[in-house]
Amino acid sequence: MANSAQARKRARQSLKARAHNASLRTAYRTAVKKVIKAVEAGDKAAAQAQLVTSTSIMDRIADKGVFHKNKASRQKSRLSAAIKAMA
């Protein structure tokens, strides 16, 4: 257990940040799944619409430092390639 006041405060802050980051990661995963589901269903228009929203979510999360900007870029690239491959 933390002994100093600043260590206790950092422990409180890290718990709060962990919960917030977890909700952001959940939103990211949900957005990606929606794009993949639309691609698998063969609905190109819905997939593109979902890609726009998921791209926004990915960029926001990468800006906040929840995960690296290269990960967001890689995911966006793979999702858009999957949509382009639909024909």
Curated annotation (Swiss-Prot):
Biological-process GO terms, alphabetical: translation
Keyword entries, A-Z: Ribonucleoprotein, Ribosomal protein, RNA-binding, rRNA-binding
Chain spans, region Disordered: 1-22
InterPro entries membership: Ribosomal_bS20, Ribosomal_bS20_sf
Descriptive protein name: Small ribosomal subunit protein bS20
Function according to Swiss-Prot or TrEMBL: Binds directly to 16S ribosomal RNA.
Gene: rpsT
Keyword Ribonucleoprotein found: yes
UniProt-recorded Gene Ontology molecular function terms: small ribosomal subunit rRNA binding; structural constituent of ribosome
TM region(s), chain numbering: none
Sequence similarity: Belongs to the bacterial ribosomal protein bS20 family.
UniProt feature, compositional bias: Basic residues: 7-19
GO cellular component terms, semicolon-separated: cytosol; small ribosomal subunit
HAMAP family tied to this protein: Ribosomal_bS20
NCBIfam families attached to this UniProt entry: S20 (TIGR00029)
Species for this entry: Laribacter hongkongensis (strain HLHK9)
